[in-house]
Amino acid sequence: VEQTERSRKLAEQELIETSERVQLLHSQNTSLINQKKKMDADLSQLQTEVEEAVQECRNAEEKAKKAITDAAMMAEELKKEQDTSAHLERMKKNMEQTIKDLQHRLDEAEQIALKGGKKQLQKLEARVRELENELEAEQKRNAESVKGMRKSERRIKELTYQTEEDRKNLLRLQDLVDKLQLKVKAYKRQAEEAEEQANTNLSKFRKVQHELDEAEERADIAESQVNKLRAKSRDIGTKGLNEE
């Protein structure tokens, strides 16, 4: 009976210890599961941030490409304006030379007029006025061309500055994407390790649960044997009293 009682107590102690181990493993497993859920949420948020950063990077790249195209177009327009300005400048010089020539001829004509060539002089004066008007018109057009050229130069400077800013933003966004991707990889690795640890603890939990079931079964058997022995002992005591 004492041996059976000790077995029962040992079984009960083993049952208590096993229950405590089960509770500890259950707490650890719950903590790991919560940690994995948090890491999954962080990973999802990081993936969203990466997608937004990549989209922003693409938008900045498109904007930079457009700015470069606009700058190229403005440079082409500036070149055309410069060519036009150079052409007008050449025309201006030619007109000035023509006026000088005509003025010289006019001076000569005045001499002729003094000798009776008044009609020829009037024609030359009319021609001089006509050329002066043309020169004035050309000068106005030249001034407009210079104004347009300066405006184009300012626009090119603005586009160049904007292109440089877009390029810097593009580099910054690319660096951000690289850092976020590294962070995502680290979270994925931690999540995989946590899941592996959770699976290991689950296996341990199942093993301990099996041991607990066996310990409970042994405890029940021991308790049943103790009860039988007690009943048998009472029967033996009763029979002894009756025989006396």
Swiss-Prot record:
Keyword annotations: Actin-binding, ATP-binding, Coiled coil, Cytoplasm, Motor protein, Muscle protein, Myosin, Nucleotide-binding, Thick filament
Gene designation per UniProt: MYH7
Higher taxonomy: Eukaryota, Metazoa, Chordata, Craniata, Vertebrata
Keyword Nucleotide-binding: yes
Identification of the protein by name: Myosin-7
GO cellular component labels: myofibril; myosin complex; myosin filament; sarcomere
Subcellular location, principal: cytoplasm
Subunit structure: Muscle myosin is a hexameric protein that consists of 2 heavy chain subunits (MHC), 2 alkali light chain subunits (MLC) and 2 regulatory light chain subunits (MLC-2). Interacts with ECPAS. Interacts (via C-terminus) with LRRC39.
Alphabetized InterPro entries for the sequence: Myosin_tail, XRCC4-like_C
Species whose genome carries this gene: Papio hamadryas (Hamadryas baboon)
